[in-house]
């Protein structure tokens, strides 16, 4: 319909000119003015038609493209803020490319280059639908796919998210259990986080967004008598450099292999997901947090390993600082004289401004957990790489923190449970630090605070230490911490 409207505006133009005018017109279209091929007809057949003067809900459509035949309907009913932003950006990109083509600076083949979706964003949400049989998978995938727009709308309401871009293509997903046959389908959603000024640590809680989506899908499955205990939805957060572990090889461009840990898809119905986002090159592995014990002096958000019988939560941080914000790729403005080209005036309905919806704020404290005390730990403490130097913490839960823990960022990550180990770690090589840390891990913690002064960690986005007494952890949680 957009092409037909372009042909109406330029009835005598040749094909190459129409392509250029197509991108010119709709890259500058003032949405939500509707695109109409003809004025709506009035018939007394009592069928619902798109008319914002009569239907208040039609006034909130963001990108109305109206079908010409009666009853007229909005063909882009499912367009969201993010979807419209992606399409407008592509219109501008197409305009820039066609400008180059008309100036003989590029070939027409450039207009058909594959998109760079899997290189465009730094953070992604993976949705996975699984079923025991192929027939059930087809039904289950159809239901989940029809509800993804609800998840996108929920993510857009998060005050820290600027864009949620869904890849329209679904992908097969490898099965976790080789002994049990499963049929799995996966969708990928790219995220752009808002750049916050005067904030070094940004905590984003996606628990409510993901949970409301899964509840809606399961409720619909129950109402349609499709629900069975073996059909599931899994959701997780991954970074760009982890995608090659989960997607087919032909989807991603070939590049150097990265040495990273394996990523495990965790069902939302099984455990909570606690993720720490420190840099583009870091990697977060979701794991259950119900029985995890870590070193009490670990105050940088790095969960250290313990005995093999206990689930391990890892967060590996590289030593180079990178900004985790992904600015949206702004398309190059049209070159040449396209700005001076006139667009024929057409009669359109006045723009119906969308009433802003109430913003649901879900702020999770970004204050790092420091000096959390528990009983002396006798388990093996695994040495982890030091995080980015110079990353500041906003505040500390208590005022009695030992000053030895804040000398440098490197001392903070390499410290063990005693002052003597801190002094010796500076002189020992990397391999000896790990062994020495294991020998000293059973020593009592200096400067321990009484239990009455311990801070509650239930509101922290990156829980690195659990108290001695287990606390209730909300299930189905996906929390991110972005360090500026």
From Swiss-Prot:
Record field: compositional bias (Basic and acidic residues): 423-441
InterPro entries in the cross-refs: NuclTrfase_I-like_C, PolA_pol_cen_dom, PolA_pol_RNA-bd_dom, PolyA_polymerase
Name the catalysed reactions.
RNA(n) + ATP = RNA(n)-3'-adenine ribonucleotide + diphosphate
The UniProt entry annotates the motif Nuclear localization signal 1 at: 240-257
Q: What class of enzyme is it?
A: transferase
Against Gene3D superfamilies, the record matches this protein to: 1.10.1410.10, Poly(A) polymerase predicted RNA binding domain (3.30.70.590)
Look up the EC number in the record and give it: 2.7.7.19
Localization per Swiss-Prot or TrEMBL: Nucleus
Q: Which domain of life is it from?
A: Eukaryota
Q: Where is this motif: Nuclear localization signal 2?
A: 392-407
Give me the stretches of Low complexity compositional bias. 451-464
Q: How does it assemble?
A: Monomer.
Q: What is this protein called?
A: Poly(A) polymerase alpha-B
Provide the species name: Xenopus laevis (African clawed frog)
